[in-house]
Amino acid sequence: MSLPNHSGSSAFKSFSYIVGTGIKRAAKLSTRNPIEMIVVVLILSSFSYFYLFNLARTSDIFSGTVTRLYPTSVYAPTKDHSFSVVDRTADSTIANNAVKVHLHQIVVSDPKHGVLSRQTLASVLRFQQMAENEIYVPDSTAVNRFAFNKDLCYKTTLPSSYSSHSSDSNSNSNLNSKTSPCFAHSPADIWQDEATLLADKNIRSTIEANLDTAKNVFGDLQLNATYASSVTLSYAFNTTGDYREHLADMWKHKVATLPPADLVSLSNIGQQENVFAWLFIVTRNVIFRVKELIDLADNIDIIVILVGYIMMIATFISLYVNMRAMGSRYTLATAVVFNGFFSFMLALLTVRALGVDVYPVVLAEAIPFLAVTIGFERPFKLTKRVFQFSKETPLTKQEIRTTIMRAVDTVALPIARDCFMEIIVLVLGAKSGISGLEEFCLLSAILLAYDFIIMFTWYTAVLALKLELLRIREINGISADDIKKGTKKSTGYIRRTVIKAFSDDHAAGANTANQKADGPIIGRVKLLMIVGFVVMHIFKFCSAFQSVGPQVNITEPSIAVVLDQLLEQHKASSQASLPLFVQVFPAMPFHVATVNKSFVPDAITRPLEALFDTYAVYIQHPVISKWLTIALFVSLFLNTYLFNVAKQPKQIVEQVNQDKKITNAIESTNNTHIEVTEKQKPTIQSPGPVVSSAVVMSPNHKRSHNHHHSHSHSHNHHSNHHQSDIVRPIDECVALVRTPEMLNDEEVISLVENGKMASYALEKVLGDLQRAVGIRRALISRASITKTLEASALPLENYHYDKVMGACCENVIGYMPIPVGVAGPMNIDGDLIHIPMATTEGCLVASTARGCKAINAGGGASTIVIADGMTRGPCVEFPTILRAAACKLWIENEGNDIVTNAFNSTSRFARLRKLKIALAGKLVFIRFSTTTGDAMGMNMISKGCEKALSIITEHFPDMQIISLSGNYCTDKKPAAINWIEGRGKSVVTEAVIPGAIVEKVLKTTVAALVELNISKNLIGSAMAGSVGGFNAHAANILTAIYLATGQDPAQNVESSNCITLMKAVNDTKDLHISCTMPSIEVGTIGGGTILPPQQSMLDMLGVRGPHPTEPGKNAQRLARIICAAVMAGELSLCAALAAGHLVKAHMAHNRGTQAPTITSGPAPSTGTEPGTCIKS
């Protein structure tokens, strides 16, 4: 018998270990990042608040009604000729094949003037026409929509094929197809339409002629005075089936919330009444609702609820008193209350998501019992233990995180145990099947779970901030004890008595033994209270949570006559053999619109009304409310960031002072140890010619020195990483891995070299990107043959590594500066644009600038984008060539739209424009050509291709995907298909240069240029078998602009496809030049364009980021600029070749200065001017 006990004990220990570990991790995360945790919980609670507020706005609390009526259900079995009232929850008494009908009524009232005026009756008839024929449900246009007269109404003669009357599917598809009249009861029974009414000369006589109908339609009818206070419209809905019932409810909601017109719904009374009237209505409804509930309840119910509210108030008072006794006046007690409030909102939202309706009556009765039984004992216990541990030593000498974690360790498992047992009891109550009790127990169980989670996350973060504030007070000389002493001196006798009555004897913290003894007793008492509460309701000792409100009075003439007519017509129909079940719903009140008069001046009410209307719109709107929450999220995180930045300088000064004290102490006591350490430290010597002898410094010391100076500018919070030269043992360093700021650089290097830390993960582990790059650089340098990288001239500091990580490069050891020159400005399509070019080739920028000057003198360049489509060419395989051919034909014909729709569904910007399919044996190559907005688009189109291939696989299951990229694109490789079909942006540019400019600026003639272009660019390239290379040096200019603007340099292979054409025009006096580039692959978002230097160049061109109104226009503009710049470079180089200036210019420019030897100091001036390039 011992084995089972041992197994059960082991299982319990395992469960306790899992729960304890989870609590510790949550608490550790909260204490490490308290502000972030508070922000996250506030955001979740904000989402819950917006949703619940929108839900409350639709409640009748906000409408003009005072008393809430519940529907009355009546049932007529097959043989009965009258209705009998049935319980609305007793579904078992209703036959499965019963015809179900909902009866909704609209009551239009005007007690002051009556409703028998011609104008009012005309408004009612117009309203009836609109309600029956113009209100469609549901709102979505993506599904079939239905109106009352055509689809929703109950028709006395249903189709003869009617069967399976309770089937949802039958109800959805068999919406009344015959044109039999709908059942409705209204003034239209007297006047057919508005025209008939207006033609009626004597309304009183007409009513007398139809007196029986009029008595049931008009309320308080007085013929002698031609007066009636109200008019009733009755509508019967066929709700046989859940879908029909849902449609009827939607129709009712849309009618009840119609905007004010001639008739105003009391549900929308706030839209017509002023703000003060609306607030008065809400207050009045709440008061009358409470009075109604008190009248309906038994005396014992009232006593139980009243005692519950008194105990709830006492619980709140006790909480504040006990927290004040521990040293927190209002902060922690308010935080505990908010902890419970957040849990309550999240629990209510969860219960709503589970499809359980919790009525306001249940909530009103449940809140005091929730506050008392669940209470605030758990957060109070945690707070008390935290303050006990914080008083063991001065706060200035404590690690706040450690103090809170000690407290969590001692109380976590007892709290979890009590909470778990209470949840089990409440879950059993939720399974009891008693209406009201089920909802209460389910809500309580979920609330307990949320309260437990939020306490060890949000409230723990609040405790961490509270202790930090107390520590700051102690540093400034003000302790919590001093505050408590100051408050106790002024406490009177009565106040002390009240505080003693509501306070916990051990709130200030006595001995631990007593607390351990009291803790289980409190938990057991609470558990017994919950058990007793559930048992009391199961055995019906009291009826709270089960009271049923007043129902619709079906004996009123306006309802009774309608029910009799409904039953009579049903018995005369083809479905007389079926039972009839009718639910009579409360009437929807409307009143005739009147001019409002208020005792409050318009100057006050109008601004308040505008404010409330704006608030209602933004809070109720399903999209705007989410964006408001996101804006709150961003705002809170920005404030968090700024708060951290604001408090850093003070912390740094304190840390520096402490470091100085520690350093002085070490130097005064351990000088011998430090000298030995320095002697033992190895020195790495670099080859002589590389390092200058002007400064003698070891590489390690130099790196630390540089790293220190860089951190003083951009990483102040890590300035003390490597101030100590003592390298601790590896085991001690491993223990400090989670606090990398405590390790110096040499210790991190030793961890990597010993396999305790991955080199590629340095950024993630250290949290300081620049420090990680420097350490990786040292590691690679020491492992290399030459060992020169660590002290090399490759820059390290002041770079945006946060933009690089995870996007542009891995295993970063620095960055490579490339000089950026500017050609131009160049007149491109009427705009003067400076062209940035990053290059190390001398003469390139100057040559392009000369071409710009010549083109500008001729009126500038004109460009046009003739095609835009990034491509991807996956490769798939079939078992036979017949299946491959069948796939090709299917994609080119009926499958084209299917594939296109699947592709386009993956992105807002990617749009499939063209498909080109080729076969090679059993292999099929599909070339997708797609517009991708302002992105270059390779990732975007790859995602679309995957989706399209999955759709093709559904039609061809035997298809096998070989590769998502089958080199049929073709990307980063020379290919004729890009030259012929195009890829990316296909651009053409042209310019006309006068002959005089050719001779003056370019130093040659038009004839010489034309002849050179034909011989070199056309015939020469053809002789070489070139594909797309009919140009002089298009790749030169394109790649320079690519590097400057963050494009993919490897794509210059296909992007440089260009044909340059020159022709003598205007009687051979002027030169016409054009460049055609069919495959320029560029983007202005993503990739290297996220780096700030590259973004600055895009800013200079005016094409950074996505275009605000026309997606893709910025990327097309960049392609136009590149093509025009290529034309300028082509023109200048061809002119230099024609004039024989090329060699002279390159010799002068590239050999003008001698490259200096790298030294640790600034390079001395050579005193020579750089060489000149092609002169104009």
Swiss-Prot record:
Top-tier EC class: oxidoreductase
Gene3D superfamilies referenced in this protein's UniProt entry, alphabetically: 3-hydroxy-3-methylglutaryl-coenzyme A Reductase, Chain A, domain 2 (3.90.770.10), HMGR, N-terminal domain (1.10.3270.10), Hydroxymethylglutaryl-CoA reductase, class I/II, NAD/NADP-binding domain (3.30.70.420)
Cytoplasmic side: 1-34, 321-330, 377-422, 466-524, 644-1176
Name of a matching Pfam family: Sterol-sensing
Broad class of the protein's primary localization: endoplasmic reticulum
EC number(s) given by UniProt: 1.1.1.34
Cell compartments where the protein resides: Endoplasmic reticulum membrane
Biased composition (Basic residues): 700-721
Protein name as it appears in the record: 3-hydroxy-3-methylglutaryl-coenzyme A reductase
Organism: Phycomyces blakesleeanus (strain ATCC 8743b / DSM 1359 / FGSC 10004 / NBRC 33097 / NRRL 1555)
